[in-house]
Amino acid sequence: MTSWLLNFPNINLNIAEPIDEFVRYININYGEVFVAAKKMLSIFINGINGALDMIPWWLMILLVVFATKKLMNSYRNGVIYGGLLFMIGACGYWHMMNETLAIVITAVIFSLLIGLPIGIALAAVRGADTIVRPILDAMQTMPTFVYMIPAVMLLGPGKVPAVLATVVYAVVPVIRLTSHGIRQVDQEVVEASRSFG
């Protein structure tokens, strides 16, 4: 008599079949679009990877050491980072590191290309922030692997789904910071710039 109060009811909600059918429908009807997009992104990623592979290992380490010195004003940190980079190569992972770096550079480029215009538009339209903020909050709280699942389902495994998942995750701070930065410009500066044309 009280079993329905203690045990969860047997509802048997099946969402796997509709999702499988939707993915199958997308792949059948729009598969060529995804294949073309995957090829274009692969060419872009491989181009960056090829450019990174052309940089000699010793030059890459020196660039990291001197960039760290310039940015952090510390040779000690530069030498540490250079040593760690050397260890990556010594362990035989130099090419894999370049592949990962190419994925990250590609994701950063696309995040900026997508996020900057959206952030500018959000700053220009009053009230849009109240609509978009919950969406951005939800996007930022999800782990990147959540975005990887649909990307792999539609594009297959590889570098391109990794780039797409990273872009979706990284575009949120770009949008937020662009919008916030534009809104925080002092009104007197805006008026002065308008008066000068």
Where in the sequence are the language-model features?
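Transmembrane-helix boundary motif in ABC transporter permease subunits
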Residues: 66-70, 88-95, 107-136
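Juxtamembrane membrane-interface segments at transmembrane alpha-helix termini
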Residues: 89-101, 114-116, 175-183
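Cytoplasmic-side transmembrane-helix entry/capping segments in multi-pass membrane proteins
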Residues: 76-86, 103-104, 132-140, 167
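N-terminal, non-cleaved signal-anchor transmembrane helix
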Residues: 1-102, 109
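Membrane-cytosol interface at the C-terminal ends of specific transmembrane alpha-helices
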Residues: 123-127, 133-134, 138, 142, ...
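Loop-to-helix entry region at the N-terminal start of transmembrane alpha-helices
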Residues: 95-111, 137, 144-174
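Alpha-helical transmembrane segments of multipass membrane proteins
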Residues: 65-67, 85-86, 116-121, 148-150, ...
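Alpha-helical transmembrane segments and their helix-entry boundary regions
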Residues: 77-80, 96, 119, 130, ...
